[in-house]
Amino acid sequence: MPSPLDASSLNRFRGAFTAIVTPFSADGSRLDFARLEEQIAFQKQGGVTGIVIAGTTGESPTLEEGEYRELVDRGVALAHGLGLLAIVGTGSNSTAHATHLQKTAAKAGADAALCVNPYYNKPTQDGLIRHFLAMADAAPLPIMLYNIPSRTGVALTSETIVRLAQH
């Protein structure tokens, strides 16, 4: 189980974080890592605290396994090389897949994980709790809950968030 975050650890996440897009080649056949590097450098010049890699804006549900892993590895390394924090989207509608993505992000050195509610299957609040606890236990990364019910079909309640925060 991850250790609780203290106030000084949470202070690292103050400031602006940009959810970056995942750049592809002109024909869409491969990731464009030169453009990724340019994009992250541009964010640094803009004064952000960090970036979000492989979030919804970053095409996370459509990336193949190898693409996701390489994007996360390179994106985290580029961000850290510029002194930026890197939050990685690890959400999925499958708990097994989400925990796998959580481990991938941790291995890459991500500073935190952005975890969306499982989409399409509309879990109960107890189902959401089990899903997010499995993610928390999969890797020692702080988790940021991404509650977007218009896209996932289910909203986290404040009671559920309180229960998760006690983990």
What label would you give each PLM region?
Residues T160-H167:
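Active-site/ligand-binding-proximal alpha/beta "capping" segment
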